[in-house]
Structure formats: structure tokens, C-alpha cells
Amino acid sequence: MDKLSIRDLSLEGKKVLVRVDFNVPIKDGKILDDVRIHSAMPTIHYLLKQDAAVILVSHVGRPKGGVFEEAYSLAPIVPVLEGYLGHHVPLSPDCIGEVARQAVAQLSPGRVLLLENVRFHKGEEHSDEDPSFAIELAAYADFYVNDAFGTSHRKHASVYRVPQLFPDRAAAGFLMEKELEFLGQHLLVEPKRPFTAILGGAKMSSKIGVIEALLSCVDHLVLAGGMGYTFLRAMNRQVGNSLVEESGIPLAKKVLEKAQALGVKIHLPVDAKVAKQCDSGEDWRELSIQEGIPEGLAGFDIGAQTIELFSKVIQESATIFWNGPVGVYEVPPFDQGSKAIAQCLASHSSAVTVVGGGDAAAVVALAGCASQISHVSTGGGASLEFLEKGSLPGTEILSPAQS
């Protein structure tokens, strides 16, 4: 990695501002999934072992900005952090201002302080309009560490502006290093071959950039989920009432043509679980794509033959990247295809398997096989943008590695 690492910093007795991604699902004050908190712990534990004073900054959700909203408070994160650390973690009721400055001043080496949601201030998301927000955050610390890969595709103050105020002192945390290693080295730079990318999800248009980027480096491209029906329509297949982006059909045709020119093998569903609607998961059946899906029915998951086809492609690959479910995984039995993909990846222990965050990561967790995947990214949109562009605003801006 060509960026400064926390291993390169002289941390004893120093204050370190750490941008973490604690944007976890919270319901009724309880955290539903703490994977992102757990993923940041190696960096936090390391800093504490080095006798640094650790100041954590994060966001949760999408508050309006400019006002405190209890629904988006980081308060529910405190007991989870305390459970991992084994000691009290104070929460500053604001991330800037006198109350935050006092909390930082009182923070001792070897302890952790959590600042309240940075998105309660407009200066976080609109740093060009209010540069003072970044300046105030930066004033707290001697060093800056970015361990928030999942947010690093955004040019927000705590990710992009603040590190610019730490010349030669803005480093990557361990989670960030791991993300860059797997998405960069193992996928973009030196993938073991054959290299297969599996892309699902609803909309093709939101992933066209990463599709075109992947065409230049993969051997196989598996396309399914809602976007798969747009490609099938582009091939003049009858898909009934399945989700199709009409405006995306010309783009899909261009992708198919480019793949053929580059020698990339495209794999699309050959059958589907169909129903009139997916709400209840009832009255479904499997139909062949060759025969076509009639009007009045829509595909909500891949069928048994497609599972077998995709599994064979996976088993014959040495590197696999997966982003986006291949069906409506929230509604059984339309979860079977996505779970089968997850289990197939998990069983292929000799391959490098990378799951690109978001819904695919949720499926892997539901299937109970996350620990058997080489790397489950903490960034959905961030992982796709990194694969498309090769870097992110929040990673580009970090200090260069020491020579």
C-alpha cells in the first residue's frame, strides 16, 4: 500500500482523531448488526496499546444537518464499544464547540472518546460552504486515521477535508488497509485467474461504470437480480413483468458487444422463480428463460438450473467478487438463489472470495458463512466506486507512505 499506515506513527501520549464508519442499523435504540463496529476494533485496540488518546468520529444515517435528531444519535453505540473495550467510553453531546473541546482536553492516553454524529452539522456534508467545521475537528489531535472505507467515496469534511489539515500525519487504519489490499491488490492489480465478477441488485444504470471497468479485468461476468432482466430484454428474451430499465437496454447491448470483443464470458439466468407478486412468497413456480416469462408474471429469484450454472462458474474460478443479491432475498423462497451463491463462495476455500458490502454482505450473514469468505467489505457503494476508479477521495487524500 502506498499510503501512510498507523504502524508508521509515533503515538505514545498523542491524541489521534479516527474517522470510523459506525453507520449501523439501529431500531428502538438497539443495534441490529455491529459488524462495522467490530471491524474497527483492531485499529482502536492498536492505538490504545500504543498509549494514544483516541477520538472517534462517525455518522449514523441521514439527519437533516444543523439540528440534533435523537433517532440518529450515536448513544446506542456506546454500550457496544464499552463491551469490546472493557471500560467506560464517554460520548460528547456534540462533535464541535466548547463541550467537545472540554471532552477532548480531559481525554487521557489509553482511553477512548466518542464524538456525537458529525452529520448533525451542515459543515460535514457541505465542507466547501463551511470550512470551519473541518478546522475545528482537526484541532483536537496530533494525528488523523481513516478507518471508514465505507464512507470514503464521499468528499465530506471528516473524510476529505480534515486529513488535508494533517500534512504527513494522515494515515490508514487496519480496516482501511485490508479493504485496499483485497479490492486493490487481489482484484484490480494481480487477481488469480480465472477471475469472475457476480453483479446483482435492482438497477443496471447505477452499476454501469463498474461493469465497464470490470470488463477490462475479468474473465467471467455473471449478471442477475433485477439488472439481469434488462440484459435479457436486450437479448430479446420475454421477461413478462420483471423489473426492466427500458432506458438501460441500449447500454446493456453495448456491454454485451464489448464483452464479446474482449473475450469476457457473460453468464445470465437460464430460469427464474416467478410469481404475480413477491410480497408473500406464495404461488410461485420456476420457468425457463428460453420459453419466456408471460405477461402478468415477474421473476424474483434465479431458478435451480441457474444456481447450478452459476455454481459451476464459481467453482472453476480462482478469484470471485460478488456485489448485489440475485433475488428478492428478504422474502422466502426468493432468498434461495442468493443464499446458494453465498454458500458456494464459502465452500470454495482455495479461491480469493470478496463480497462487496451492502445487500450481498447481508445475505452472507444470513447464510451464516461470513467467516468462510476471504473478505466481506464494509463498503457497498465505496467498493463499487473503488473498482470503477481505482481510488476514492478519502483514500487519495491520505499521506503518502514513508520511503
From Swiss-Prot:
GO terms for biological process: gluconeogenesis; glycolytic process. InterPro entries: Phosphoglycerate_kinase (IPR001576), Phosphoglycerate_kinase_CS (IPR015911), Phosphoglycerate_kinase_N (IPR015824), Phosphoglycerate_kinase_sf (IPR036043). It is an enzyme of class 2 (transferase). Keywords: ATP-binding, Cytoplasm, Glycolysis, Kinase, Nucleotide-binding, Transferase. Its main location: cytoplasm. Gene3D superfamilies: Phosphoglycerate kinase, N-terminal domain. It comes from the Bacteria. GO terms for cellular component: cytosol. It is found in: Cytoplasm. ATP binds at residues 207, 299, 330, 357-360. One of its GO terms (molecular function) is phosphoglycerate kinase activity. Its EC number is 2.7.2.3. Substrate binds at residues 21-23, 36, 59-62, 119, 154. It catalyses: (2R)-3-phosphoglycerate + ATP = (2R)-3-phospho-glyceroyl phosphate + ADP. Monomer. This is Phosphoglycerate kinase. It comes from Chlamydia trachomatis serovar D (strain ATCC VR-885 / DSM 19411 / UW-3/Cx).
